[in-house]
Amino acid sequence: MKKFFALLLALVMALSLVACGEKKDEPKTDGDAATYPEYFAGMDELITAAKAEGELVVYGSCEEEYLAAACQHFEELFGIKTTFQRLSTGEVQAKIEEENGNPSADVWFGGTTDPYNVCAAEGLLEPYAAVNASHLISDMYKDADNNWFGIYKGILGFMVNTDELARKEQEAPADWADLLKDEYKGEIWLSNYNTAGTAKLVVNTMIQKYGHDEGIKYLVDLDKNIEVYTKSGSGPSKNVGTGECIIGIGFLHDGITQIVDNGYTNVSLIIPSSGTS
C-alpha cells in the first residue's frame, strides 16, 4: 500500500463507526493541539504519521452517499485529503487483480465479502490486526487472517412492486424456486454476475443451497425469467417503486432505502422462506 499509516487510521475509524452508529465525533482543540474521540486514545504517533502521508484514496463498493460521508468525516477529523471512486464490488476485484500488487488506491470500503476473499487468497490485500476489531459482534464478521473487517451486514431477498403484481393478478414469490415460474418471465431484475458483488453472492447462495451442479442449473433456468441485469447490486431496488422492475433480487436494506427515502409504499420486501445469505 502507498499510504500505510493513513490506511490503518481509516480502518480504525471505520470499525469505530460500527460501534458508534450515526454519532459524529469531531476533534476538540486544546490550544494548538487536537484532542480526538476516545477510541483514538494512544494513537497520536499513528495520526501524525498518517497526516505526513498527505492523502488517502478509497475504492468504495457501498452506496455513494455512505461512502462520501465516511470519506468526508475522515478528512474533517484528521485534515487528510480523502478521495474516492465508487465501483461495484466485482469491479474493484477486477481492478485490484489488474493492478497486481501495485494499487492506485489505499482502502477498499464496503461491498460483499466473496470478492474480498478472492483477493485475500491471491495475496492482494494487506492483513492488519485492528485494535478496534473487538467492536464487531462476532468473529464471523471478519477474515480469519485479518484481511478484511465487516462494517455492515445485509439480507439477500426479493423486492416486489405490489401494485404491478395486483394489476397482473399474480402472487409475490415466497422462495427461490418460485422465481422460476413461467408467469414471472420478463419481470425479474438482478445485478450482473461480472460486476456486482451482490450477484456473486446469489451464485454462492445457490451453490450452497442446491450443490454446485444443481445451483448452476438453477441460475441457467432463472436467466430465462430475467429482464435486466444491472451493473450495480442496488440497481434492481431503484426501479421497483416506479414499476419498471416488478421483482428485484438484492439486499433488502436497499429496498428499505427506497421506501424510506423515496416514499414508495408499493414496495414489499420478502425474505426467501427456505433461507438466504
Provide a role label for each language-model segment.
Residues 193, 233, 251-255, 272-274:
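Histidine- and/or cysteine-centered catalytic micro-motif in compact active-site loops
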Residues 52, 76-78, 101, 184, ...:
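Short, structurally constrained coil/turn elements
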Residues 235-238, 262-277:
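Extracytoplasmic/periplasmic substrate-recognition and gating elements
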Residues 41-51, 57, 61-81, 158, ...:
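Short, polar/charged alpha-helical segment
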Residues 49-51, 150-151, 198, 274-277:
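Short, flexible turn/loop "capping" segments at secondary-structure junctions
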Residues 114-118, 246-266:
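A ligand-binding cleft/hinge motif common to bilobed small-molecule-binding domains
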Residues 1-53:
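Short, low-complexity disordered leader/linker segments with a strong preference
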Residues 57-71, 83-99, 103-244:
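Extracytoplasmic ligand-binding site segments that recognize negatively charged/polar headgroups
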